[in-house]
Amino acid sequence: MIQKNAILDVADNSGARKVLCIGFLGGKKSATVGDVIVVSAKVAAPKGRVTKGKVYKAVIVRVKGPIRRLDGSIIRFSSNAVVLVNDQGDPLGTRVFGPVRKFPVGEFTKVMSLAVEVL
């Protein structure tokens, strides 16, 4: 579960390294895997597409807290991570690093296709 003012890792090659969660879409108080959030880039690579201080949308791909699946198994990751997306839901980067949690059918298919491992 991600709350406001959480510092998150960026799991793509858009140029950002760390982002700050500044809001949620849909009037929610917190977010989990698959939710779109509003972030501000805090640490960025000098020659990336993303500049420090600008506001972007991102989809959450990993959370530290346990996620229970329908079959009863529990999955958890070692870091909280996001992938930066545009208004249409397409990723800003061309690669996604690390494992990604599976999204519902029809949501963020391009993010899942770029990921190395989908759990």
From Swiss-Prot:
Q: Which GO terms describe its cellular component?
A: cytosolic large ribosomal subunit
Could you tell me the keywords of this UniProt record?
Ribonucleoprotein, Ribosomal protein, RNA-binding, rRNA-binding
One Pfam family matching this protein = Ribosomal_L14
Q: Return one GO MF term.
A: large ribosomal subunit rRNA binding
Subunit and partners: Part of the 50S ribosomal subunit. Forms a cluster with proteins L3 and L19. In the 70S ribosome, L14 and L19 interact and together make contacts with the 16S rRNA in bridges B5 and B8.
> To which protein family does this belong?
Belongs to the universal ribosomal protein uL14 family.
Name of the molecule in the record: Large ribosomal subunit protein uL14
The organism that produces this protein has a lineage beginning with:
Bacteria, Pseudomonadati, Pseudomonadota, Alphaproteobacteria, Rickettsiales
